[in-house]
From Swiss-Prot:
Mg(2+) 2 binds at E417. GO terms for biological process: lysyl-tRNA aminoacylation. Its cofactor is Mg(2+). PANTHER family: LYSINE--TRNA LIGASE, CHLOROPLASTIC_MITOCHONDRIAL (PTHR42918:SF15), LYSYL-TRNA SYNTHETASE (PTHR42918). One of its GO terms (molecular function) is ATP binding. This is Lysine--tRNA ligase. InterPro entries: Aa-tRNA-synt_II, aa-tRNA-synth_II, aa-tRNA-synth_II/BPL/LPL, Lys-tRNA-ligase_II, Lys-tRNA-ligase_II_N, Lys-tRNA-synth_II_C, NA-bd_OB-fold, NA-bd_OB_tRNA. Mg(2+) 1 binds at E410, E417. It is an enzyme of class 6 (ligase). Keywords: Aminoacyl-tRNA synthetase, ATP-binding, Cytoplasm, Ligase, Magnesium, Metal-binding, Nucleotide-binding, Protein biosynthesis.
């Protein structure tokens, strides 16, 4: 342990010495005048140039003498040439001793990795075939005071990558790719829904009654109104109010907050897509979801086969559709239908499976507990799990043929819940009764049970058309499409404990 501590201290001393040297260089720049100029305007991006002139030979580029202005961070400095990186990629810039003044040549020698420079010149190609800018002018725009991570080892400490995402993005192309994909996914989802006549809306983040999901909220206090408020756990009840109001197809992509555990699959602040469409049911949402997921896989990967870890998920095949009840029996052949239909036997099975049984649960909730413990993790390929018991679906419409269950599904891929959807409950009296049942659950010790929302009941009393709604976890979806093992890998700034 002492050896590790000594090594860490040595590294810190070395870094401090490098920072001190860079600060001296910055002081010298300040003495010259403006050390942070802001009058340069580039006309090209590094990777765009690489693509645009990929087929041009050395001779063709020399004859064309194409002028360009680029800027970026120095990632390699060999003296005679540097490699700079901008938001699109990298390009070499050549330090031509014949065209650059002595003062500039001397300055270039003092520049460090991480410094941000501008470069003007003409495009050329090296004998090895690399495209580069033969510089006629180069300037330091921003002096970097901290050294970049060692080029051979990079930024390999996972926690440091999360805490200092700005450094992670500088040095790890894989990280940059992940977040480009995330942006691409969200943009395509938005386009997909707008093309189908959905209206994008925004609903409150601060709510007086946290509703729309079974979760523990973050609580805050509104000073001016002197009242307790909650960060939203879901936008559902507000979106359905909009359907009541006549916006028959709406969606929102935004943050939700749940005051719960942190894991590779859970972050207290996460991004959710929720959409609602009138005159549709949960089966319509299944079809829409399959179509969306296939488009996203094709867009990101060029294929409907999605590699994840040592598995491949097949989005091109029809997603399996199976009820909660049937899935328990399919994946646990030692259990019988009679086991799941008897409350005492179901309670014993749930306890033995490791579920946190409080003792007051009804049969439906016990069945879901059994499903969560014994089935969820086995659902590797895409599965729509349907017919959730009404006890755990307080906002979903009861099934016409079996009122003990609801017209609801959850989508599982790789053993993880990715989406939750149902035909919406639009019976105001039934909704009021279910809210009261949720209040009783909360009084019995269930922190995640819902509050009674009188205004939402009132909205339903005006009449909501038959509607289907769905929520899709954007973070987990991006995890799948980027083969990322942790939700923190796909959130730019995940929540972390403060450093000691």
């Amino acid at each position: 342990m002492s050896d590790l501590k000594t090594e860490s201290q040595d590294l810190q001393q070395e870094e401090n010495a490098l920072i001190a040297l860079r600060k001296e260089k910055l002081a010298a720049e300040r003495a010259k005048g403006n050390a942070f100029p802001n009058d340069f305007r580039r006309d090209s991006y590094c990777n765009d140039l690489q693509k645009q002139y990929a087929d041009k030979t050395k001779e063709e580029l020399e004859a064309a003498a194409i002028p360009v202005k680029v800027a970026g961070r120095i990632m390699l400095n060999r003296g005679s040439f540097m490699v700079i990186q901008d938001m699109t990629g990298r390009i070499q810039v050549y330090v031509n001793r014949k065209t650059l003044p002595e003062e500039t040549l001397a300055a270039v020698k003092t520049w460090d990795l991480g410094d941000i420079i501008s470069a003007e010149g003409t495009l050329a190609r090296s004998g090895k075939g690399d495209l580069y800018v033969e510089m006629t002018n180069v300037r330091l725009l921003t002096k970097s005071l901290r050294p970049l991570p060692d080029k051979h080892h990079g930024l390999t400490d996972t926690e440091q990558r999360y805490r200092q995402r700005y450094v992670d993005l500088m040095v790890n192309e894989e990280t940059r790719h992940t977040f480009r994909v995330r942006s691409q996914v969200i943009s395509h989802i938005r386009k997909f829904l707008i093309e189908r006549d959905f209206l994008e809306v925004e609903t409150p983040m601060l709510q007086t009654i946290p509703g729309g999901a079974a979760a523990k909220p973050f609580e805050t206090h509104h000073n001016a109104l002197d009242m307790a408020m909650f960060l939203r756990i879901a936008p559902e009840l507000y979106l359905k109010r909009l359907v009541v109001g006549g916006f028959e197809k709406v969606f929102e992509i935004n943050r939700n907050f749940r005051n719960e555990g942190v894991s590779t699959r859970h972050n207290p602040e996460f991004t959710m897509l929720e959409f609602y469409q009138a005159y549709a049911d949960y089966r319509d949402n299944m079809d829409l979801t399959e179509e969306l997921f296939r488009e996203l896989a094709q867009l990101v990967l060029g294929s409907t086969d999605v590699p994840y870890g040592d598995k491949v998920f097949h989005f091109g095949e029809p997603f399996v559709r199976l009820s909660v009840f049937d899935s328990i029996l399919k994946y646990n052949p030692e259990l019988t239908a009679a086991d799941l239909q008897d409350v005492d036997r179901a309670r014993d099975i749930a306890k033995k499976a490791g579920a946190k049984v409080l003792g007051h649960e009804g049969l439906g909730k016990l069945q879901v507990m059994i499903f969560e413990e014994l089935v969820e993790h086995k659902l590797e390929q895409p599965h729509f799990i349907t017919e959730y018991p009404f006890e755990v679906s307080p906002l979903a419409r009861r099934n016409d043929d079996n009122p003990a269950v609801t017209d609801r599904f959850e989508l599982f891929i790789g053993g993880r819940e990715i989406a939750n959807a149902y035909s919406e409950l639009n019976d105001a009296e039934d909704q009021a009764e279910r809210f009261l049942a949720q209040v009783a659950e909360k009084d019995a010790g269930d922190d995640e049970a819902m509050h009674y929302d009188a205004d939402f009941v009132r909205a339903l009393e005006y009449g909501m058309p038959p509607t289907a709604g769905e929520g899709i976890g954007i973070d987990r979806l991006v995890m799948l499409l980027t083969n990322s093992p942790s939700i923190r890998d796909v959130i730019l700034f995940p929540h972390m404990r403060p450093q000691a």
